[in-house]
């Protein structure tokens, strides 16, 4: 059954979100129209503002409305000589939530994937290389995901960074706190044994 053209357009637009199929999009549209039009208008306004005003930090490439994100603009953090390389802005939020890292970030906005046409240019590696060449970076922490693509990306960046004589480290991978060994996959378990620490 077809609805009004505007309702059909709303449902189709909601389907662009990850994990939202036709039924979920339809439920969302009905919820906004039937029960919460005020929230729908607020959502539309926030979405419109974000789409027109949010861009990328000129230093680290995370999302911001300004030229520099708050971390890069911070006198203390922005002048740190340690850069943590991550794949997405969501990774920055996850690390920041832990509260243990006090350096700068560099957001790749993806990972190397030649089959998908994603190479060094798409990841902004020329900008990262300029940061390394400036002489202001003493350590590069590679925090890409522990996937085949993430590992390949980390190795590519490590090779690039070695030319600039900076310390290169990789975040540890292993058994999660509170996890049970019987549920951990064999690759993670192998990484845990290889990366074990003395007590």
UniProtKB/Swiss-Prot annotation:
Q: Which family does it belong to?
A: Belongs to the RecR family.
Name listed for the protein in its UniProt record: Recombination protein RecR
Keyword DNA damage on this protein? yes
The alphabetized UniProt keywords are: DNA damage, DNA recombination, DNA repair, Metal-binding, Zinc, Zinc-finger
Question: What residues does the Toprim domain cover?
Answer: 81-176
Record function comment = May play a role in DNA repair. It seems to be involved in an RecBC-independent recombinational process of DNA repair. It may act with RecF and RecO.
Q: Which GO terms describe its biological process?
A: DNA recombination; DNA repair
Q: Which NCBIfam families match?
A: recR
Q: Which SMART domains match?
A: TOPRIM (SM00493)
Which sequence ranges does the entry mark as zinc finger (C4-type)? 57-72
Q: What organism does the record attribute this protein to?
A: Shewanella sp. (strain W3-18-1)
Stored PROSITE patterns: TOPRIM
The GO terms describing molecular function are: DNA binding; zinc ion binding
Which InterPro entries does UniProt cross-reference here?
Answer: DNA_Rcmb_RecR, Rcmb_RecR, Rcmb_RecR_Znf, TOPRIM_dom, TOPRIM_RecR
Q: Name one Pfam family in it.
A: RecR_ZnF
């Amino acid at each position: 059954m077809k609805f009004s053209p505007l309702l059909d357009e709303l449902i189709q637009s909601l389907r662009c979100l990850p994990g939202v199929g036709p039924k979920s999009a339809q439920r969302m549209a009905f919820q906004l129209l039937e029960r919460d039009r005020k929230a729908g208008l607020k959502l539309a306004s926030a979405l419109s503002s974000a789409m027109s005003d949010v861009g990328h930090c000129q230093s680290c490439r995370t999302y911001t409305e300004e030229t520099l994100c708050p971390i890069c603009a911070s006198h203390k953090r922005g002048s740190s000589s340690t850069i943590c390389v991550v794949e997405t802005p969501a990774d920055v939020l996850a690390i920041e939530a832990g509260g243990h890292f006090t350096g700068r970030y560099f957001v790749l906005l993806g990972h190397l994937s030649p089959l998908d046409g994603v190479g060094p240019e798409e990841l902004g590696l020329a900008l990262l290389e300029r940061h390394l060449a400036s002489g202001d970076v003493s350590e590069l922490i590679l925090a890409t995901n522990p996937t085949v693509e993430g590992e390949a990306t980390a190795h590519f960046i490590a090779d690039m960074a070695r030319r600039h004589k900076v310390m290169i480290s990789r975040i540890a991978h292993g058994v999660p706190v509170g996890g049970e060994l019987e549920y951990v996959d064999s690759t993670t378990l192998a990484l845990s044994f290889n990366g074990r620490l003395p007590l």
